[in-house]
Amino acid sequence: MDFFISTKNRTDKEELMDDFSIGGDLLRDTLDKLENINRWLGGNLVTVNSLKSVLKNHPKEAEITIVDIGCGHGDILRDVAKFGRKHDYKFKLIGIDANPTAIIYANELSTEYPELTFKTEDIFSDEFKNRKVDIVLATLFLHHFKEEQLVSFLSDTLKQTQKAIIVNDLHRHKLAYYLFMLLSVFIKNKMIINDGLISVLRGFKRKDLEIMSQKVNVKPQISWKWAFRFQWIIQK
């Protein structure tokens, strides 16, 4: 745990969660606790509210295919499903994650949501690139990749997406780092503490998102949200 840090540039340190072989009780406990932390801080609402904005003028009788990349155990998609049911949308929801244990757990937790399916899949694979979807969700996911990977991925994904890519990710800021360090005193999970601090340092400044927007030739729609999140909506 580093006390003196710089947020000028994104770190290239890897998180423990980048190892897709991690599974068992450790991963399940990590995903459960992350869900609780994100709900407490209001992070999941950033994604749902972004979706609400994108669907503002969408006819409710038309089916909407939404893919959540890096879905973990599916908490975001279950929130999206609840939103869809409440507002009478016809959602087809697909969760994708490279960790097979996460996908198994997502299926176990989503038996009451027939509109959800989960798949173990690599977002850089041809299988993913051949998907045709309306909306792609990326919540606390893009910071796992380097800028050149993200520019390539976003360029390809825009071609297969009919409406929008919705990004909800971390603001790289010293205060966010130290606040998480303080919060970690109450977290009984070493994986979350390690990865949470690295995640902040792998996060983004507004300028990073603006530069990537230019590179993929889209008009940036970037808003800062609590707690140290950037909402980045890329609409077609």
Segments predicted by a language model, with ranges:
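Conserved beta-strand signature within the Rossmann-like core of class I S-adenosyl-L-methionine
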Residues: 161-170
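N-terminal, positively charged/glycine-rich alpha-helical extensions of SAM-dependent methyltransferases
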Residues: 1-32
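Conserved Class I S-adenosyl-L-methionine
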Residues: 206-236
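C-terminal alpha-helical "lid/dimerization" subdomain adjacent to the S-adenosyl-L-methionine
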Residues: 170-213, 222
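A conserved beta-strand element that flanks and buttresses the S-adenosyl-L-methionine
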Residues: 137
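Class I SAM-dependent methyltransferase Rossmann-like catalytic core
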Residues: 24-50, 54-55
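A short, conserved alpha-helix within the catalytic core of class I
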Residues: 145-156
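Class I SAM-dependent methyltransferase SAM/SAH-binding core
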Residues: 67, 73-75, 80-125
